[in-house]
Amino acid sequence: MPPKNKEKGKKSGAQKKKKNWGADVVAESRHRLVVLEKELLRDHLALRRDEARRAKASEDQLRQRLQGVEAELEGARSEGKAIYAEMSRQCHALQEDMQTRSKQLEEEVKGLRGQLEACQREAAAAREEAEQALGERDQALAQLRAHMADMEAKYEEILHDSLDRLLAKLRAIKQQWDGAALRLHARHKEQQRQFGLTPPGSLRPPAPSL
């Protein structure tokens, strides 16, 4: 094989290696993107479950306390009515005591309701933060996808540019090789003519290979 063909084989192998390297980089980037999406989705779902569980537990606890206080208030009122009916002499004192107790219980109920509303506001704020985190994740994924698309375009541009340069070099080498073959053929033909020989048909110039 001529030296030029050996050089052509080496360059072709280097070109294939460079193309495979670019494909490996793109595949690895896509794999990392998929892993990142799964991790972010898992973290987001875990956060939402924890927040919902805490909010539900707080709401149930406050509701139970509220029901207990309301039951106690109703029992106190019923007890006051029974005492008033049975003990008229202590009616006024018991009324004052029950009214005071009722006010205290009502204040406690009011405070518990305020705590319940605060808990609901905190749950709403937690949901808003989770939605914001999800939006930031989507934005980060969009930026990563755009970066990957830009990388793919650059790799494709580099590959095409390398192929164009390689083809240009091969064309230049072919022209040099064809010119040398033609000159060698003409020289052999002239030498045979000098010795009175007829050039055989096998000494025709080589046909172009590109």
UniProtKB/Swiss-Prot annotation:
Coiled coil: 49-161
Ranges for region Disordered: 1-23, 188-210
Cell location: Cytoplasm, Cytoskeleton, Flagellum axoneme
Domain of life: Eukaryota
Principal cellular location given in the protein's record: cytoplasm
A GO term for molecular function: identical protein binding
UniProt GO cellular component terms: cytoplasm; cytoskeleton; motile cilium
Compositionally biased region (Basic residues): 7-20
Keywords tagged on the record: Cell projection, Cilium, Coiled coil, Cytoplasm, Cytoskeleton, Flagellum
Function: Component of the nexin-dynein regulatory complex (N-DRC), a key regulator of ciliary/flagellar motility which maintains the alignment and integrity of the distal axoneme and regulates microtubule sliding in motile axonemes.
Family according to the record: Belongs to the DRC12 family.
Assembly: Component of the nexin-dynein regulatory complex (N-DRC).
Entry protein name: Dynein regulatory complex protein 12
